[in-house]
């Protein structure tokens, strides 16, 4: 598989671990608690959002640190969220759904839902 070929680890969810309609934070929390190592920052890239670069992630983490934020999200130049989420571990370890200390970075990522979005 692509992940195997590129040395990317996969966290498989048990069938009854989460439901399709669960909030994204629930899914991310499940993944975080199934890691063997505790991280201070967790980066989530949605598979249907190509175009985000490692430099965007670095910029987001630096923005988080500089402004003492708990969450940074990526937005395109059109102001639409584009699948890049950078979370402080406190967000995943708490019962909060969203952060009160949120920032954003502009990236070239784009969220794809339909064929027309590829154009």
Task: Give the location of each predicted region.
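Conserved N-terminal catalytic core of the sugar/cofactor nucleotidyltransferase
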Residues: 1-38
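Conserved core of the sugar-phosphate nucleotidyltransferase
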Residues: 21-30, 41, 46-119
């Amino acid at each position: 598989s692509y992940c195997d070929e590129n040395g990317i680890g996969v966290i498989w969810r048990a069938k009854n671990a989460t439901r399709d309609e669960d909030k994204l934070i629930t899914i991310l929390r499940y993944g975080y608690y199934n890691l063997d190592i505790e991280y201070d920052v967790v980066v989530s890239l949605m598979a249907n959002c190509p175009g985000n670069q490692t430099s965007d992630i670095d910029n987001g983490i630096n923005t988080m640190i500089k402004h003492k934020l708990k969450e940074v999200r990526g937005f395109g130049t059109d102001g639409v969220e584009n699948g890049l989420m950078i979370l402080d571990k406190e967000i995943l370890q708490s019962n909060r759904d969203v952060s009160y200390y949120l920032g954003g970075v502009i990236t070239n990522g784009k969220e794809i839902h339909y064929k027309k979005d590829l154009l």
